[in-house]
Amino acid sequence: MRCLLKVTIPVETGNATIADGSLPKTIESILAECKPEAAYFAEENGKRTGFIFLDMKEPSQIPALAEPWFLAFDAQVEFHPAMNVDDLKKSAPGMEKAVKQFRRPERPKAA
């Protein structure tokens, strides 16, 4: 299953690993292990954040994917199922069924 692995590095840890030169080498090493489809890095809420897209074959991979970030950076790690455009197209029948089954009637708007 395609997943977004979101990694948030605390400012203090990020600063320390930049100062000692280990941040880029460690990230490169972790990414070499997890073999992502894509990896992007940006600021989110004032912290260094990685958005890493990868194919997770089974949930038992979660510790192997998360632990390097915990151990190297004291990072916060989140996993989110993700879809590409083809996946989204395939999901259309399920969405249509949900709309028919669960959509609430429109409520009149107040004047």
Model-derived features: where do they sit?
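Conserved, structured core segments of small domains
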Residues: M1-A111
